[in-house]
Amino acid sequence: AGIQPIVFSAITGIKDQRFPHHQFLAWGPAAFRFDFRHWVANKYGRGFIYKLSTRTVSLLLAPFIAIEKLALGYSSQWSWALPAFIRGYWLIKTGKVDVVYSIGSAWSAHLAGVWLKRVTGIKLISEVHDPLVIRKNPNDQGFEKPKNRDARFRHYLESQLCQYSDFVWWFTDGALHYAKVRNPQLNRPNNASGFVVMPGAEPPGSLQGKFNHVYTNHLNLCHFGSLANDRSLSTILTALVSLVNKYPKARKCIQIHAYGAPLDSLTIDAIKKNDFSDVLLAHGRLERDPLTGKSGRERVTEKMQEADVLILLHGQDEWCAEYIPSKLYDYLWTGRPIWGITHRNPQLDQMLLERRSYLSVEGDESSIAMALERIWLDWQQKQLLKPVYMPIGVDQAVSRILSEVLPK
């Protein structure tokens, strides 16, 4: 396509050999300490050298970290923008860069992008993964000036992106909506053009397109990904107690499988309280199988396709209105029924309903209990919902971006 990417990143990841990849240590003392620990661990392991060097560096940097916190109060990542800006400025001035593309999660990438745009005038494209402004409740539009200095700076940075980026996009309708409310200059002349891009996902490894599902003696409900107290399987275990009281046979037939992350404390407590150690099975992270040679990702895909129903936990924080779990895009490729427990996100609900999914409202115990009962009854009849197969690939994201950035 005639595009030669030059990648800037932190030093903590693996260096990409396909194209120029510059890895920078952050210059601030707190971020330097963080990056240094990961760099030493990757290079020498976590043995004697790691312990000696990291403790020494921590002691030497301690007073400077305290000064940084008192003077600025930002999260440590901010200082990564300094080397990224300097290197980027040099590449731009020597004619090696035509467009800056800032991608974050980490807001320091956007900060470096804005600096480069303002100093050089280069075209800036920004992709915002997570909300920069965290709202507290449905009535909070995000106008209030945060007391926390890091949050206050992120508020300012969002306004900078909406003003100086040539194009800026978010991953959900909700995220774009609230950004536009706070930044009415968005999509106006001499400001950024903002829109929504659904990231999608490539088909998972070892995906079997015509997988014929086999019903077994157990109803297997499977969750993949991270868990936390605000995104917990305990809500399903609570519903299971009610289901077992109504259908005692369900106690021996239902199994809940958790892959990829440790259990959260609420789930652990619910297991102990209800004696569900044989019901909820924590498999942890699936790694490469030395016997079959299958990668961890391939094994995960197989487990997804073997599931009777895939569990999608959305969370309970207000920012769920601006967030769609990336795991959904992997789920959609498997062709298995999804049970989504969602929170204040009409776009996500519509996506699930269009594909014939089970749907519950986070925090609504009766809604969750009703969905679990329906799944149980459907499984007994071997009539689980047959999803409408509409996976979302990355090709549509590319088409969407091109439709916005190319001259009309």
Say what each PLM segment does.
Residues 247, 253, 257-261, 265-301:
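Nucleotide-activated donor-binding/catalytic signature segment of Leloir-type glycosyltransferases, i.e.
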Residues 152-193, 349:
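A short, active-site helix/loop in glycosyltransferases that binds the activated sugar's phosphate group
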Residues 169, 204, 213-231, 237, ...:
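Conserved donor-binding/catalytic core segment of Leloir-type glycosyltransferases
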Residues 75, 82-90, 108-111, 115-119, ...:
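Membrane-proximal helix-turn-helix segments that form the acceptor-binding/catalytic region
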Residues 231, 287-305, 310-329, 339-350:
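Nucleotide-sugar-dependent
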Residues 3, 32-34, 180, 195-218:
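Acidic anion/phosphate-binding donor-loop and adjacent secondary structure
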Residues 362-370, 376-408:
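A charged, aromatic-enriched C-terminal amphipathic alpha-helix characteristic of glycosyltransferases
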Residues 7-79:
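A conserved catalytic-core segment of Leloir-type glycosyltransferases
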